[in-house]
UniProtKB/Swiss-Prot annotation:
Keyword ATP-binding (UniProt): no
Protein name per the record: Large ribosomal subunit protein uL14
Keywords associated with the record: Ribonucleoprotein, Ribosomal protein, RNA-binding, rRNA-binding
One of the protein's GO biological processes: translation
GO MF, one example: large ribosomal subunit rRNA binding
UniProt subunit comment: Part of the 50S ribosomal subunit. Forms a cluster with proteins L3 and L19. In the 70S ribosome, L14 and L19 interact and together make contacts with the 16S rRNA in bridges B5 and B8.
GO cellular component: cytosolic large ribosomal subunit
Function field: Binds to 23S rRNA. Forms part of two intersubunit bridges in the 70S ribosome.
InterPro entries assigned: Ribosomal_uL14, Ribosomal_uL14_bac-type, Ribosomal_uL14_CS, Ribosomal_uL14_sf
């Protein structure tokens, strides 16, 4: 569960290391985001020659949460930390590589590019 002020690691090669959620998109009073939800983030830590700079604001999709996601068969998939992939204004990934596993819940038409770039789909 991701909410405002939550810090997430970045699971792509855009140059951002850590981002902070500043808004959960999808409804005026929406408080929490889970895997597959789009959030508005600001870059808190970035590499020197990366594609993004500290302080810039982007859309991002949550790909891993410590809270996890419950499947229809009753199983629960949890991760060690929270991670997101940065998106542009058209909701396409900015990076060209994805690091770490992602879940099957991202397999919608909107995020098939992320699933295809990921090294492992759980």
């Amino acid at each position: 569960m991701i909410q405002t002020e939550t810090r997430l690691e970045v699971a792509d090669n855009t140059g951002a290391r850590e981002v902070m959620c500043i808004k959960v998109l999808g409804g005026s009073k929406r408080r929490y985001a889970s895997i597959g939800d789009i959030i508005k983030v600001t870059v808190k830590e970035a590499t020197p020659r990366g594609r993004v700079k500290k302080g810039e604001i982007y859309n991002a999709v949550v790909v891993r949460t410590a809270k996890g996601v419950r499947r229809q068969d009753g199983s629960l998939i949890k991760f060690d930390g929270n991670a997101a992939v940065l998106l542009n204004a058209k909701l396409e990934p900015i990076g060209t590589r994805i690091f770490g596993p992602v879940t099957r819940e991202l397999r919608s038409e909107r995020f098939m590019k992320i699933v295809s770039l990921a090294p492992e789909v759980l």
